[in-house]
Amino acid sequence: RDTDPRKINLGVGAYRDEAGLPYVLPSVLEADKRIANMNLDKEYLPITGHSNYQKLAATFAYGADSKPLKENRIATTQSISGTGSLRISGEFLARHYPYNKEVYLPTPSWGNHRPIFQNSGLQVKQYTYYDKETVGLNLEGMLRDLKNAPSRSIVLLHACAHNPTGVDPTQE
């Protein structure tokens, strides 16, 4: 057993203390206090989420100078969690995407990704991502696999902190 006090087990997707109990970061506790002091009305949000949050999130993701954003060609919706967002995306793509109904997931991918997309009605394929020997990105394998995927394929890319490896592409 590793007793180093700097060690944190993130295998379950949450911080845990040395007894295996949930550990809430001080910054999260402070955010909770600030939100509680705002005296929010606790009303339900519209089904697609908080419109100002969506606008700010789209601007953050695409950039304020994004042509599609300026032309109102970006649609957003708010969901609960990454799992919820993947399920909404999978359902939407299975019903409305007119092309290839296969989604390509990185290898490895989080354990629930495959069933989420399968249960949404998509076929799941995989592309190379992680290299165990270098403990990094297998860029050559990833590019090869994505190049060999059919045109207009659906590809799940992690914007940062690839789940479960934490390995991100670099600008190089």
What are these regions (language model features)?
Residues L29, N39-E172:
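Conserved core of the PLP fold type I
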